[in-house]
């Protein structure tokens, strides 16, 4: 008979994937245990088996994140509908860019009014198949974008500042970012995007 699962939780694994400790109630607790041991390791959420192997599973935090990201991706403009495909490289790129934006704490903008969030503003992601990238810009709340409650000069300055800030963040995350055709928008292409640990 094969192994049967015993406990689901956070575990600390060594470099050789050997079980070092756990279960822990959170990833932070597992990472703190790693610091306490002084030995290299990694925190993994999963099922501990009878032979002490750990089968990775999505953590509650992962599941909540994926649900939130999915909600944000639903805000993409209708022009993405014909492009979203496992075979299209832009699909992977827009998902990576969207994840980076949302991880930063910024919402995606609902450019075409698919959800009630359209007036709130956020980051616009527009496909650019000819350039093999995603055009990124900032959309302000309707109070600024439509009604210009602080005046046109302030609205224009905020638009350019926020768009540049988003571009700077994506550059820091390893994407290739360049000003798009002399506009205030930026073209984002795939670069050397790195994933960091929670301690970096």
Where are these regions (language model features)?
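Short aromatic-glycine-(Arg/Gly/Cys) micro-motifs in beta-strand/loop hairpins
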Residues: 1-18
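A short, charged, amphipathic alpha-helix used as a generic interaction element across diverse proteins
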Residues: 24-45, 167
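Short, mixed-charge low-complexity intrinsically disordered segments
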Residues: 39-68
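An N-terminal amphipathic alpha-helical segment
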Residues: 67-75, 98-148
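Amphipathic alpha-helical segments
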Residues: 90-108, 161-173
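Short, compact, well-ordered microdomains
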Residues: 157-191
